[in-house]
Swiss-Prot record:
<dbReference type="GO" id="GO:0003899">
    <property type="term" value="F:DNA-directed RNA polymerase activity"/>
</dbReference>
<dbReference type="GO" id="GO:0046983">
    <property type="term" value="F:protein dimerization activity"/>
</dbReference>
<dbReference type="GO" id="GO:0000428">
    <property type="term" value="C:DNA-directed RNA polymerase complex"/>
</dbReference>
<dbReference type="GO" id="GO:0009507">
    <property type="term" value="C:chloroplast"/>
</dbReference>
<keyword id="KW-0150">Chloroplast</keyword>
<comment type="subunit">
    <text>In plastids the minimal PEP RNA polymerase catalytic core is composed of four subunits: alpha, beta, beta', and beta''. When a (nuclear-encoded) sigma factor is associated with the core the holoenzyme is formed, which can initiate transcription.</text>
</comment>
<dbReference type="GO" id="GO:0005739">
    <property type="term" value="C:mitochondrion"/>
</dbReference>
<keyword id="KW-0240">DNA-directed RNA polymerase</keyword>
<keyword id="KW-0808">Transferase</keyword>
<keyword id="KW-0548">Nucleotidyltransferase</keyword>
<dbReference type="InterPro" id="IPR036643">
    <property type="entry name" value="RNApol_insert_sf"/>
</dbReference>
<protein>
    <recommendedName>
        <fullName>DNA-directed RNA polymerase subunit alpha</fullName>
        <ecNumber>2.7.7.6</ecNumber>
    </recommendedName>
</protein>
<keyword id="KW-0934">Plastid</keyword>
<dbReference type="GO" id="GO:0006351">
    <property type="term" value="P:DNA-templated transcription"/>
</dbReference>
<comment type="similarity">
    <text>Belongs to the RNA polymerase alpha chain family.</text>
</comment>
<dbReference type="InterPro" id="IPR036603">
    <property type="entry name" value="RBP11-like"/>
</dbReference>
<keyword id="KW-0804">Transcription</keyword>
């Protein structure tokens, strides 16, 4: 498993945003150019423009040999799942997307996840329309522990109604070596105040699935 160590060197509240310098260590596990390219790409992406706004659960009882699905409220629990439906709903709403086709003029999509097998279901198991790309495809959503039911989950994905401006105002970085000749990066990141530079960086790491995060 790959780990990064992240140290906040300086953090400052500006009149029109936030500024932070932080050091990222333990880069020996990565191709440096690839890591930099991925982080820059995810920091500068419009990660918040598309969101899951509604999650609906449909269940059928496999023991009754019926194909009829019934709506289940997300405040209920199902003993065939390890997680509650409310917890699963929250995990769905953390997923982030990118619009792949600039010619698409709509402002909403629908996606579906069919859960028949007994297994861990990941965000990559969701069936999306071709215009939409999932950015965090390895997130664990829930675990199904019984064949007694089949679960169908319908997702509504919408664009934000308000105009969105990217929170990143400035991004600079350098790669250096310490006294042990280990590579590390210094990030100079300024945001517009809607998100702190450190949280923006963490969100980029989580969306890119490059590493597992831990406290230094």
């Amino acid at each position: 498993m790959k780990y990064l160590k992240i140290y906040v060197l300086r953090s400052r509240l500006l009149k029109d945003g936030n500024l932070a310098f932080f050091k990222v260590k333990n880069l020996q596990f990565f191709d440096k150019n690839f890591f930099v390219t991925e982080i820059r790409r995810y920091l500068l992406l419009d990660l918040e423009s598309w969101n899951i706004t509604n999650v609906m659960f449909f269940v059928t009882n496999n023991l009754k040999n019926t194909s009829t699905f019934h709506v289940v409220h997300n405040f209920l629990g199902l003993e065939e799942l390890k997680q509650s439906l409310l917890e699963i709903t929250k995990k769905f709403k953390l997923l982030r997307f990118k619009l792949c086709s600039k010619s698409y003029q709509g402002n909403k999509f629908f996606a579906v996840l069919n859960a028949f097998e007994v297994k861990d279901f990941l965000s990559g198991d969701i069936i999306f329309p071709p215009h939409l790309k999932l950015l965090n495809s390895r997130e664990l959503l829930f675990t199904k522990i019984s064949f007694n039911i089949t679960l169908k989950i319908l997702l509504k994905i919408e664009a934000k109604k308000a105009s969105f401006q990217k929170p990143i105002k400035r991004l600079n970085l350098i790669i250096e070596k310490d006294e042990f000749f280990d590579n590390y990066m210094i990030f100079d990141l300024t945001t517009d105040g809607s998100v702190t530079p450190f949280n923006a960086f963490i969100k980029a790491l989580q969306s890119s699935n490059l590493v597992t995060l831990t406290n230094a």
